[in-house]
Amino acid sequence: MATAAGEIYFIGEKDLRTKEFTQYFKVGIVRENENNADRDSTQRLLEHQTGNPRELYIESVVKTELVELVETLLQKKFAPLGVRGEWMLLDSDELAKVKSEAEILAAEASEIISDI
């Protein structure tokens, strides 16, 4: 597993007809490296918006030193909430739990990197 820093993003959806927010969230990553220095969660949002009939928005972003590890741990821990790929169906309490766990794992990743 690579040790790249980056961002864990939480992208949500809003129905354009009803104006209601859905409970679907994409939990994905953007790696920081010199090959895609201009790529961040906002850029990923635009990429995902193409072809999606609902309005996407960034619910939250967590920066971490070990982005792939943090994402893998989140996806494994919350697998029962997964719908398809990186998409999860989360009520507000579940979303808060996943975001909190992402923050905790990101802090632990910083400690690991600082010890190296």
Residue ranges and their predicted role:
Residues 1-116:
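Non-catalytic accessory segments flanking enzymatic or RNA/DNA-binding domains
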